[in-house]
């Protein structure tokens, strides 16, 4: 399953987010795959596309970062997959 993870950095914590990232990396548990990410132009939000078969791995990863950022996790499907499923229904 793919998920769009929307991170909203807590006020005044942006520099700490990047300091931790440069020091420790993404800190992903095995089985959670980073696909790509985008940063808002004001550097207050990060949009990360992640993939996993076990949603609980997202909770494990979020626990590494939730002192610095708030999270919203939205399960997503790519358009071609959804279109193919609708044709079969």
Locations of the language-model features?
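Short S/T/G/P-rich N-terminal loop/turn motif that feeds into the first structured element of a domain
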Residues: 1-35, 39-45, 53-57, 77-89
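Conserved catalytic core of Hanks-type protein kinase domains
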Residues: 51-52, 64
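Short, electropositive alpha-helical surface patch
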Residues: 58-65
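Conserved short beta-strand edge segments in small beta-sheet-based binding/regulatory domains
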Residues: 68-79
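N-terminus-centered regions that define maturation/targeting leaders and the start
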Residues: 18, 66-67
């Amino acid at each position: 399953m793919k998920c769009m993870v929307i991170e909203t950095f807590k006020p005044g914590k942006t520099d700490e987010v990047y300091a931790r990232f440069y020091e420790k990396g993404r800190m992903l548990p095995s089985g959670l795959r980073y696909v790509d990410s985008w940063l808002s132009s004001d550097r207050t939000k990060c949009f990360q596309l992640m993939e996993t078969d076990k949603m609980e791995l997202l909770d494990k990863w979020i626990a590494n970062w939730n002192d610095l950022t708030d999270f919203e996790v939205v399960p997503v499907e790519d358009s071609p997959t959804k279109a193919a499923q609708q044709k079969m229904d």
